[in-house]
């Protein structure tokens, strides 16, 4: 009996070790240097080149699983956009702490710049950090919103950006596993679009994007964080198309 238990234990350990090895190898394959942004792929498009874009977000915007490289660097190097990356992993939209989205957007250096577009990540961290969801208000003034709630923070960012930065706003959602909290945020994001005339890039709800990751384990390091390959082939093309659409309207 002891031999049987020992053999089973060895088998289980072997399977686990194999799974971990495959997982690590998939990430390495997805982060090969050949997938990095490369200026040789630059093809000038006047609607994108030299535009000033502010990115506000957390780990997906930062590139937490791809050595700090995300779609931001792809857009900068391969489309010649002037990008300002205000991204910190693990941070939430809501909160009075200095690293929350709602506090970082108020940095003085940002208010001194002229941006053609603000792109804000719909954070996947608010639910994990137990932030209250909140609700959409009737008011429009940014001082009316409760920034300690996620929806209040979203409304504040929209109002502040329109008033202070005078720029159009694009919120983007992120691919991730099923999460009722995040699903409810996406629902309310569309409600805010009706109220505030914002743009949405719904990667979370994009059927094509979600299908790709089912068949290629090297595109993502986990359920949410892309590798370089994932940024190159999933996020960046979606962003380029959406940004072109938005900026074409502004001309």
Description of each model-found segment:
Residues 52-54, 60-141:
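Conserved SGNH/GDSL esterase-like catalytic core that processes O-acyl groups on lipids
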Residues 30-34, 93-98, 147:
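Short, flexible loop segments at the rims of nucleotide/cofactor-binding pockets, characterized by
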Residues 102-251:
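Alpha-helical cap/lid subdomain in secreted, periplasmic
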């Amino acid at each position: 009996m002891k031999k049987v238990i020992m053999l089973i234990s060895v088998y289980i350990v072997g399977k686990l070790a194999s799974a971990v090895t495959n997982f690590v190898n998939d990430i390495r394959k997805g982060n090969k240097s050949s997938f990095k942004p490369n200026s040789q792929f630059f093809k000038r498009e006047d609607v994108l080149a030299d535009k000033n874009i502010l990115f506000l977000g957390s780990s997906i915007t930062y590139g937490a699983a791809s050595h700090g490289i995300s779609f931001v660097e792809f857009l900068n190097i391969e489309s010649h956009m002037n990008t300002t990356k205000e991204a910190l992993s693990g941070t939430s939209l809501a909160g009075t702490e200095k690293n929350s989205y709602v506090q970082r957007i108020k940095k003085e250096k940002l208010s001194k710049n002229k941006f053609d577009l603000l792109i804000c990540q719909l954070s996947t961290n608010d639910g994990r950090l137990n932030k209250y969801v909140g609700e959409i208000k009737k008011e429009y003034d940014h001082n009316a919103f409760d920034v300690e709630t996620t929806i209040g923070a979203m409304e504040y960012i929209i109002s502040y950006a329109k008033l202070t930065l005078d720029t159009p706003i694009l919120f983007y959602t992120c691919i991730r596993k099923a999460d009722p909290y995040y699903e409810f945020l996406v629902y309310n994001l569309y409600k805010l679009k009706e109220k505030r005339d914002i743009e949405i890039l719904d990667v979370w709800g994009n059927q094509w994007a979600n299908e790709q990751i089912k068949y290629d384990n090297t595109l993502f390091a986990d359920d949410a964080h892309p590798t370089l390959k994932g940024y190159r082939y999933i996020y960046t093309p979606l962003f380029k198309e959406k940004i072109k659409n938005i900026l074409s309207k502004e001309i």
